[in-house]
Amino acid sequence: MPFADELLGVPAARALTAAIQAAAPDASLTTLRAAAEVLSPLTLRERSDLLRDALLADLPGDYDSFAGTIRTAARGTLPFSGWLIWPVTTAIAVKAVAAGTDDAFDDGMRMLADLTPRLTAEFAIRLLLAHNLDRAMPIVLGWTASTDADVRRLATEGTRPFLPWAIRVPAILADPAATLPVLHALYRDEDEVVRRSVANHLNDLSRQHPELVVATTAAWLADPDENTGRLVRHALRTLIKKGNPEALAQLGFHPAEVTVAGPALDAQAVPFGGTIGFTVGIRNTGTEPTRLAIDYVMHHQKANGTLTGKTFKLTTVTLAPGEDLQLSRTHSFRAITTRRYHPGVHALEVQVNGVASGRTEFTLLAE
């Protein structure tokens, strides 16, 4: 696994062992040393989990003792940054939760903020959020005033409802407004990476709470700065693809007087792993220039025989009255790791400002 080897391979694991040994000379670290040599068949997360468990096994003392060792390692001269920090931060979170005290919880939060510039602690913090969201959120909100952009990003990225690779936090899913104060504090942040995290956080929320998201972005757009428009466009991307009328209107896409010709397909049957091409014509039949968000929806066959749609961007354009636009696109059915294709009837339709039309069926052949 070259990708995992590059990020958290044997050299990184040995570097972690060396840094911990320097901080705790009397610790044997036999479990950690052994773990460093058996990473090869494991995924990145499995490697992190193995090294986390090895740290916990080799440093079995209480939370204060464990935290002291990590702080000493962080102050040391040996390398102590990059992906080797992932198992460290998750071990801190495990220890803080297991201690069962407010002091350990608060100190664990502080340590994650201190370490996140070395490697984001967005995955580790989920354990603490899941354990006690009410106690964690005031601390997280305080991070929004940090002078360190990595800490400010941790405040919004670490609390995302659907953070990739991370465990879910039921209390955040149950109360979508719980993290809004963090977003309100950071949507004007000077750092683009922090603002992008705010947008991704809102996009997560839009999956289950579109009305909350469009209300939030409407408030921001009422008093924008030079970056608000871009942030909102990124935050609303899923709602735009779904044709949400309020989201479309916020970005200037209103009900349009247009005619749509097509999509016209270049084949009625597509070999497995092949491509299908299509063309579509759009004409503004109104009397005013019209701004259009033009997408296409590919309805894929599922294993149970039903169809499920996925929206793909075509273009954004403004058409003058009477103006025509011709578009062509090729869609690939090449095998990818994130989607399994099933042979059978598929369908394609064009979506203009959230309104779908021209649904046309074709067949994906078996391998």
Predicted regions and their residues:
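Short glycine/proline/serine/threonine-rich loop/turn segments at secondary-structure transition edges
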Residues: 335-345
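Proline/serine/threonine-rich low-complexity linkers at boundaries of modular beta-sandwich domains
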Residues: 246-260
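Short acidic/polar inter-strand loop motif in beta-rich domains
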Residues: 335-337, 352-360
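Surface-facing alpha-helical segments and adjacent helix-coil boundary elements at the starts of domains
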Residues: 1-247, 271-277, 288-291
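A beta-strand/beta-hairpin structural motif
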Residues: 309-336, 364
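Short beta-strand and strand-turn-strand segments in soluble, beta-rich domains
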Residues: 258-261, 302-316
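Beta-strand-rich binding/interaction modules
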Residues: 275-283, 287-302
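Short beta-strand segments of immunoglobulin-like
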Residues: 264-271
